[in-house]
């Protein structure tokens, strides 16, 4: 009887302790929320007052769009490099990025790591770049009066693009001759050739090169694969080198060509659960046995890493090349007042083995490249057949070839 009373007494004490702990936790959370809200309102008030004084008594007249726009971009610069603000005049540029259409010279550019310069990698046939005589390997020295030395591809690209019909002076150095050349180029509307080439080698190995994951690219990849298969293809090389990504849905459709229906290829996870998504294969594949090699390099990013990493995790392809870029962050466009937009990072991508492809120690390094941590500090994951793969930034190839 006494034992039963003691047991009941202990239950009441434990219940009371749990209630006190729950209450204490709620008080702490409420206080943290209050502190956070106070910090937000305090800093907004300080910012408003600073600008008000600048506007009233600063020695020169300020351009509100320029000054406040710089403040917004400075705030976003402290976050990841993919959260970006687009005022009304720049929204069109964001839409062009999503559709694969833009105004520029029509050439692929890339960072030459040995030279530390941005070079022309491929002028598109019939483009302003091709008509001006630009060649693969040409080193970009300046655009108009802006020197491009030690600049990254994003910086150079932003200066090559502009309004249709505008002209600029491009200065390059041609390594094959050592000569410095200048040419005047007129920008015009460009539609990216996301699938510039596919073909069949004499040894019956097929080759498909995909430049970007723009809307509809999966249909062209599907058509190319079926055509090569009808021509006797016995193995496929799928080249994603230099592919900076694009539509995740298109990436899932391409992987779905080679893996069964109802497989979760990508999960997105972030702070708000209602914004989390699972991307599954939805149709039956067209081939599950064809040997496939996926080629990647340091400029293979985002949707390209979902494709190569998904094929690796499901043991459907061998990944060959160098470690990929490591962009595993999810962005969504958010409408802002006065027709502006915010491209906002809301979560991270996780591929079939449950690893995240985002570089863990991302930082704004010189040139915009990530700093990868050693494998000894990363976590192990398993592919479908039990092979060890790791997180820690991008996809590490099964076979490393530089």
Spans of model-derived segments:
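Bacterial Sec-dependent N-terminal signal peptides
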Residues: 1-37
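Cleft-lining beta-strand/loop regions that shape enzyme active-site pockets
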Residues: 2, 30-43, 47-64, 119-123, ...
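Interdomain regulatory linker/hinge segments that flank or connect interaction modules
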Residues: 47-98, 176
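PDZ/PDZ-like peptide-tail recognition elements
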Residues: 82-122
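A generic structural motif
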Residues: 110, 171-175, 335, 350, ...
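Hydrophobic beta-strand signal
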Residues: 141-142, 318, 343, 358, ...
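Functional cores that coordinate and move charged inorganic groups
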Residues: 304-308, 336-339, 344-345, 350-369
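Conserved functional hotspot residues or short segments at active or partner-binding sites
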Residues: 356-402
């Amino acid at each position: 009887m006494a034992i039963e009373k003691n047991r009941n007494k202990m239950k009441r004490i434990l219940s009371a302790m749990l209630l006190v702990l729950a209450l204490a936790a709620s008080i702490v959370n409420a206080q943290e929320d209050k502190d956070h809200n106070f910090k937000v309102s305090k800093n907004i008030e300080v910012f408003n007052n600073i600008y008000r004084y600048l506007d009233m008594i600063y020695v020169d007249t300020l351009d509100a769009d320029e000054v406040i726009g710089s403040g917004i971009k400075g705030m976003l610069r402290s976050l990841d490099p993919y959260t970006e603000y687009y005022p009304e005049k720049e929204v069109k540029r964001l839409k062009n990025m999503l559709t694969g259409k833009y105004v520029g010279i029509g050439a692929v550019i890339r960072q030459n790591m040995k030279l530390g310069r941005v070079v022309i990698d491929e002028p598109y046939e019939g483009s302003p770049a091709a008509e001006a005589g630009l060649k693969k390997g040409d080193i970009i020295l300046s655009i108009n009066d802006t020197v491009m030395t030690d600049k990254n591809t994003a910086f150079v690209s932003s200066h090559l693009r502009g309004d249709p019909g505008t002209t600029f002076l491009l200065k390059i150095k041609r390594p094959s001759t050592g000569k410095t050349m200048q040419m005047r180029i007129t920008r015009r509307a460009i539609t990216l050739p996301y699938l510039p080439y596919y073909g069949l080698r004499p040894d019956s190995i097929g080759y498909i090169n995909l430049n970007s994951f723009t809307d509809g690219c999966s249909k062209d990849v599907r058509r190319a694969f079926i055509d090569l298969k009808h021509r006797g293809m016995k193995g496929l090389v799928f080249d994603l080198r230099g592919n900076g990504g694009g539509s995740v849905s298109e990436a899932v459709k391409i992987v779905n060509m080679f893996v069964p229906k109802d497989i979760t290829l990508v999960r997105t996870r972030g702070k708000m659960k209602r914004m989390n998504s699972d991307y599954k294969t939805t149709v039956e594949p067209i081939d599950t046995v064809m040997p496939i090699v996926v080629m990647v390099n340091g400029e293979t990013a985002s949707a390209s890493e979902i494709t190569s990493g998904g094929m690796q995790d499901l043991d459907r392809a061998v990944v060959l090349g160098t470690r990929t870029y490591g962009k595993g962050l999810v962005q969504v466009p958010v409408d802002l007042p006065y027709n502006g937009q915010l491209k906002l990072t809301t979560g991270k991508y996780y591929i079939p083995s449950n690893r995240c492809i985002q570089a863990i120690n991302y930082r704004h390094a010189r040139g915009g490249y990530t700093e990868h941590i050693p494998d000894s500090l990363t976590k192990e994951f398993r592919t479908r057949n039990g092979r060890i793969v790791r997180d820690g930034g991008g996809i590490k190839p099964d076979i490393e070839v530089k």
